[in-house]
Design a protein with these regions (language model features):
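Sec-dependent signal peptide recognition
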Residues: 5-14
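Flexible loop/hinge segments at secondary-structure junctions
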Residues: 23-318
Length: 318
């Protein structure tokens, strides 16, 4: 009997040892601060089911792409989140470094322009937002200088940094659309994107939660961030109406809200062979219970894809 127990102990030791040799580091995820709360939620649920919780870092979309496309070795991240589609120069960097990927559109998001509950409620146009924020604009010090119907209140706006996908989306959906045609044609879109440097607009790091915190005690300040952060802090701040449309789940999904955009997650194909659990993580992420119309991510503010788009997207990656 003692022999049997010893043999059993040796077998267990051998099994544990073989597992520790093959046990890799957890799946590593980087990228967008907007996508971060969604992927963190998925990672925690995945960890409970599969025993290994992916490590998720918020680096911003641009920073995430740099890390993700740097190479296919085990030290590089397996996954990156993006609050805009991959740019052609990033796709080239990936290709040059031997990285191929699966692109998953996980849902939709609206970019909120919001202030504290004690601040005014405004209906703003893209043109007015451009005039308030642009380096090439008239640089008004008060909102009333843009339009007499707007409050006699100093302009103070917190913006995401240039590395942020939210900033990229804001540029293409607001700054480009609000920029006067003659400036756009004579100087190009990059000039239209330039923000004032006189203190009216302040860049805040890759941290949407920090922007919200800075709004709460300041009734003249506005901030720019993703809908999920608004959804989770709705009792502390309120969004402005843009071009007459309120930001809601429905207006984002229908793209009626003028600053709506898709969100993405990219998975590194080269890692499927040697990062344990990565294939399962992809399947789990796109499952009905996570990303579907009634999925877990909807509960924390992700605007789901419409059912037909969701079905096509899942079919395309099988």
């Amino acid at each position: 009997e003692q022999n049997m127990i010893q043999r059993l102990i040796l077998t267990l030791v051998a099994v544990c040892f073989s597992f520790s040799v093959f046990a890799q580091d957890p799946i590593r995820v980087v990228g967008s601060s907007t996508v971060y709360p969604f992927t963190t939620n998925v990672a925690e649920k995945f960890g409970k089911l599969f025993g290994s919780t992916p490590i998720v870092e918020s680096t911003g979309t641009g920073g995430g792409m740099k890390l993700f496309c740097a190479g296919a070795t085990i030290e590089t991240p397996s996954v990156t989140g993006a609050s805009r589609a991959i740019k052609s120069k990033e796709a080239k960097m990936c290709a040059d470094n031997g990285v191929s990927y699966i692109e998953v559109m996980i849902g939709n998001d609206g970019i909120a322009f919001a202030n504290s509950l004690s601040g005014p409620q405004l209906n703003l146009t893209k043109k007015q937002l451009w005039l308030a924020m642009a380096e090439l604009g008239p640089k008004p010090s008060k909102w009333s200088e843009i339009d007499p119907s707007l409050p006699d209140m100093e302009i103070s706006i917190l913006s995401p940094p240039p590395t942020s996908g939210t900033r990229d989306a804001w540029n293409s959906l607001v700054m480009k659309k609000g920029c006067p045609k003659d400036i756009l044609e004579s100087q190009g879109k990059k000039k239209c994107y330039q923000l004032r440097e006189d203190g009216a607009v302040t860049e805040v790091g890759e941290n949407d939660a920090l922007i919200i915190q800075k709004l709460q005690d300041n009734e003249v300040r506005f901030g720019i961030f993703g809908f999920s952060y608004l959804d989770n802090a709705g009792d502390k701040i309120k969004p402005m109406t843009i071009e007459g449309v309120e930001i809601t789940l429905d207006t984002i999904q229908s793209y009626e809200y003028p600053i709506a955009r898709p969100l993405f997650v990219y998975f590194k194909k080269e890692h499927f062979e040697y990062v344990p659990g990565l294939k399962d993580f992809v399947k789990f992420y796109v499952s009905d219970s996570i990303m579907g119309p009634e999925g877990a991510l909807m509960d924390i503010g992700l605007v789901p894809l419409d059912p037909a788009t969701f079905k096509d997207m899942v079919a395309s990656i099988q």
